[in-house]
From Swiss-Prot:
Its main location: cytoplasm. It is found in: Cytoplasm. This is 3-hydroxyacyl-[acyl-carrier-protein] dehydratase FabZ. The keyword Ribonucleoprotein does not apply. GO terms for cellular component: cytoplasm; membrane. It is an enzyme of class 4 (lyase). GO terms for biological process: fatty acid biosynthetic process; lipid A biosynthetic process. It comes from the Bacteria.
Length: 152
């Protein structure tokens, strides 16, 4: 199957800050790449030991929290959704609504890079659904279906 054409090659942190309302410490993606015409793309998160979550999760054996990976998936989906409708609609916000079929497969450690491979699995008006695979070095570490609503 041929891949859908790329609409946006790279959305850097400055563009993400213009697109999403999230800010440190809850902005959980560093960039989004390869946003395609089929509403798919890849969010990138560089996991650093300096992040606040590692003060308590877990000091002796730091592991990046799974719930933050799910939020990273949702933020990636939000950027894909907003960028995909840019020019035809002007949503002001994205609201994370649902999580389904969530599985955590392997721990993510400081120093690793997570790629959130997100693809649309449905859309109805302002509602979007995405399937996401979080990967480290090509290995799936978590997966989930997430739903969101774009508002104007």
């Amino acid at each position: 199957m041929e891949e859908s054409p790329i609409r946006f090659a790279d959305v850097d942190i400055n563009e993400i800050l213009k697109t999403l309302p999230h800010r440190y410490p809850f902005l959980l993606i560093d960039r989004v790449k390869n946003i395609r015409a089929d509403y798919s793309g890849i969010g990138v998160k560089n996991v650093s030991i300096g992040e606040p979550c590692f003060q308590g999760h877990f000091p002796e054996r730091p592991v990046y929290p799974g719930v933050l990976m799910i939020e990273g998936m949702a933020q990636t989906a939000g950027v894909i959704g907003i960028k995909s409708v840019e020019g035809t609609e002007k949503p002001r916000a994205v609201y994370f609504l649902t999580i389904d079929k969530c599985k955590f497969r392997k721990p993510v450690l400081p120093g690793q890079t997570i790629e959130y491979h997100m693809r649309s699995i449905g859309r109805r008006k302002t509602m979007w659904w995405f399937h996401g695979d979080a990967k480290v070095d090509g290995t799936i570490v978590a997966e989930a279906d997430v739903g969101a609503m774009l508002t104007d």
